[in-house]
């Protein structure tokens, strides 16, 4: 099991849909979140992409020297990047970071954003382009280890004599992650990528997605790993966790929710449509309305695009829900929580000890020994909890 955190390059706050409690997205703050994830033992971080975010490659590059073991899941965007340039970017990042790059292939589903970026393809054509893009990208990087070039002539993309002189650390290339809920997305995942990511839907729906992608991959003689993207609200008790969930959306007003949902409805994204269906437009916002499956809460999706659900509960409950998804075949969990700095620590402290995963050293390379904590009465080290 791998557990990732999230770098909030699109903003961070204590409350959704308001400027109250908001934080400046400064490099110092993003670095704090990355260092927290690194020192607490997270395997990696997802860095989001889109016009609402700081550029993921610039941000990720700036965080290499601030971290030691943390991997970076960074987006490539067919239509915005050329595959040969994206291959060079990936190889250089992987070399400079010592093999800590992971690739997030993002086709995109916001038509207004895509057109603003110069991408005018329809849904089916975007997936065709993405398939050609990642095929070229993979071949260029894989052949860099033996000094070979690559030719390709496709419907949307072509290269002749494409070659990468400086190969990445990872062989044959950094692992490729990809998410999408349409049949075209599942076909692409089955044929081309290493790990399929889904947003947090109820377990029964996630199981259907996994089964479909597995069946499609089998036709190509391939196996695919699976991951899930979720928010998390964990506290020492269930009641505290649900109060925190209610607090997160306590500053929302109807107008903000209506405008957000109207914007999401215009997107050409099956995944976004499925997220919106979970809360029925957000007209009612009680726990009964938003708890769509045990401890799975759709409140985040009232105003946030993309991943819109959170696991809510005490540590044992959240860990049990994680294991429920793991039993379906999920082996990578990408979490986030508001605010991201505090919640990175809270989740690691409360939930990590309960997960069936081998934790890497929390303070890599320091050689420090415990127990840790403030000395009691100037004389005594705090006892380690036996719970």
UniProtKB/Swiss-Prot annotation:
Residues annotated as transmembrane: none
Secretion signal span: none
Keywords for this protein: Flavoprotein, FMN, Monooxygenase, Oxidoreductase
Gene: ssuD
Name of this chain's protein: Alkanesulfonate monooxygenase
Molecular function terms, GO-annotated: alkanesulfonate monooxygenase activity
Family matches, as CDD domains: Alkanesulfonate_monoxygenase (cd01094)
HAMAP family associated with the record: Alkanesulf_monooxygen
The organism's place on the tree of life at top rank: Bacteria
Catalytic reactions on record: an alkanesulfonate + FMNH2 + O2 = an aldehyde + FMN + sulfite + H2O + 2 H(+)
Purpose: Catalyzes the desulfonation of aliphatic sulfonates.
